[in-house]
Amino acid sequence: MTSDRDLIIERLADVAAALDSRDWAGLGELFTESATGYGATGREAIVERVREHLGGCGPSQHLLGNHRVQLALHGDEDRARSLTYARVLHLGAGDRSDLSYECFGEYSDLWTRTPDGWRIDSRRFHISFDRGDFRTLQPG
């Protein structure tokens, strides 16, 4: 049987893959209906906010590591917290194909176990270092 920690780490990889493949429907499925993240509230608003930044940018790669997972948050077996390092590279597209933007940071996620498995209920990303041109990120 797969541990809850491993299931959460697998979901984190699913989020990164959805971001990089621009799988908007798949990304939405990884959040609860009322989730907060990326400065938005609600699953649909979160996906729309991400689309505003990644929809028109070229290839991206979200590399994740140094996972720290705290299960049974506040004694609740259906709540968890994860802290995950990320190194993210974005390349430009179209008339911005010569641009790039890279950042290092840490995701802080709160998780809820649902009938469909673990889902993100809250997501924050703290950027500790960045370089390049943020204009690389643009709507599609």
Which residues does each PLM region occupy?
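Short beta-strand or tight-loop elements
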Residues: 62-65, 103-107
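A solvent-exposed, acidic/Ser-Thr-rich amphipathic alpha-helical stretch
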Residues: 24-88
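Short, low-complexity N-terminal intrinsically disordered segments enriched in polar/charged residues
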Residues: 1-33
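Flexible, surface-exposed loop regions and adjacent strand-edge segments
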Residues: 138-140
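Short, solvent-exposed loop/turn segments that connect beta-strands within catalytic domains
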Residues: 74-78, 94-98, 115-119
